[in-house]
Amino acid sequence: GAIDSGARAILLKSNMKHFSAGADVDGFGADGGDGSPAIEVLDRLAAIPLPTIAAVHGLALGGGFEIALACDFIMASASARLGLVETSIGLMPLLGGVQRVVERAGMARGKEIAMFGRRHDPELLERWGVINAVVADDALDEASRSWAQQLAAGPTVAYAAIKELAVIASNEGVRSADQAQEGAAQKVWASEDLQRGLESFSESGPGTAIFQGT
């Protein structure tokens, strides 16, 4: 996997016309299933202790949008269109889209996105807190790679602790995250990158550390 290979950030993108236009509905039937195998894959993506970025262009609809929602950050090109469109065929999002869009946008906006089934422009979703950044179409590749490179060069252990606490706070509340903070912080205090950061701060000031991900 990405961790075993030494990766320190993951950039998810498509070299096709669209990020992902969703599933082929021609294969759907009344017993189409609940999406459990696929949602397990996205749960693992969401839980991976590395920063993840979805770089979205073209269409990200249905399951394609749900893939992006499983990432930590979503960056979209200005002409992209994103949406949970399953209700247009009488279905519901099956890959965690409802839960994750509510987590990002709040209950009212999340239900609006999931129930109306619209294709949204990225500027609107950025205002609603669903995506992180909108860039010009011809800037998406460079901008998303820049984010990924910055994160890959950062303190990986601290990033993992931040993700852990953010998930606990979202799922179980702030009090539970407070209780888990000491354990998460212990891993950071024991990291070699923290020592590198402290030493570089003393020697040459803030923002000069070269982190190794350990």
Where in the sequence are the language-model features?
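A short, well-ordered alpha-helical element
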Residues: 1-8, 30-33
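Short, Asp-centered acidic motifs that coordinate Mg2+ and/or phosphate
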Residues: 9-11, 73
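Terminal peptide-recognition signature
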Residues: 12, 24, 51, 68, ...
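Glycine- (often His-adjacent) and acidic-residue-rich active-site loop
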Residues: 13-47, 60, 88-90, 173
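Conserved hydrophobic/aromatic "anchor" residues
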Residues: 19, 48, 82, 201, ...
